[in-house]
């Protein structure tokens, strides 16, 4: 751990104690620099967006690849970086928890573990899910700096719209030591409020396009992330332009961005 990483960790932890905030999800170092220049205070990786940059589907990236990605983002920006660790790249509680240590060594100051088993294509049993969170929380607490550990309950993005089970899992994850709780796929203000009212730790909400930050914050959300959405906005723009080019129309290429401002070379960066 460096003084720089400790400062990032403390800044990230403090964000969870202040006003609700948006944490956008860059897909590479350039997009991280852009988001920093636009004034965001912290960044989170996107598993699906990063996988796309490697020509892979979500869930097919290795821990080695994620650690290298984290190191690149950390070197590119002075913002805190939190990592989507999916299921921890192993069903075992201890080995999944070890992913926390691995990305912390690469520069991360936060990270999440979810309760979805990509091998069996199912939600982990309740007790095993809690065991995995407890193991990850233990590792996070041993790092020597305030690593912000997020525990995810995946029901609502995996076709299992059981709010009672989601709340029970998040409450158990809180008791197991998670710093932040997250149930991606909540769709309404009432669902967000029910989750936030049921726990005492900060809650991350995956953005709902039909809701504003103010509405989600009023329901209790402390942190709002966008997942892979920014990646897909960029990819769609590129695909639409490429389709026009293929048809002989080059007007879509008339785009200007302040890349020089976004990618300025600051002394001491990284």
Describe each region flagged by the PLM.
Residues 2-83, 88-226, 232-240:
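Alpha/beta enzyme core
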Residues 2-3, 12, 228-270:
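Extended, intrinsically disordered, low-complexity segments
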